[in-house]
A protein has these predicted regions:
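Nucleotide and nucleotide-moiety/phosphate-recognizing core
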Residues: 1-27, 36-52, 58-64, 71, ...
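Conserved TIR/SEFIR loop-to-helix hotspot centered on a Trp-containing motif
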Residues: 30
Length: 109
């Protein structure tokens, strides 16, 4: 595809954010996220917008990260992520219609 990277909006999980918290950025590094590393490799740049959705950190250091991120959330985490789905959709719509700066101001945090 011949889509400019700045027109690609990537949504990813983020263990460094509490479950349900959103963080939108216009560009940035992979921050240790393997999926973002792969996207950066294929796009050839870090200059693309991304929306990170907090999933929280695993309950203990020995917990397999892939199992944590791909697992089914429970309890309060599930409720927070359900609310985050709607907010993330709204943030994406805002980004597309009003621009990344407006979306960051409105939805980060």
């Amino acid at each position: 595809f011949k889509i400019p990277p700045e027109r690609v909006l990537v949504v990813s999980d983020e263990v460094a954010l509490v479950p349900g918290r959103l963080r939108m950025r216009a560009s940035g590094s992979a921050g240790g996220h393997n999926g973002l590393k792969n996207i950066i490799l294929h796009l050839g740049t870090e200059n693309f917008p991304r929306l990170r959705v907090g999933v929280g950190s695993p309950p203990h250091p020995d917990y397999d990260m892939a199992d944590w991120v791909m697992g089914v959330p429970r309890g309060e985490d599930a409720a927070a992520l359900e609310k985050a789905e709607e907010r993330a959709a709204d943030a994406i719509e805002c980004c597309v219609q009003q621009g990344i700066d407006r979306a960051m101001n409105r939805y980060n945090g």
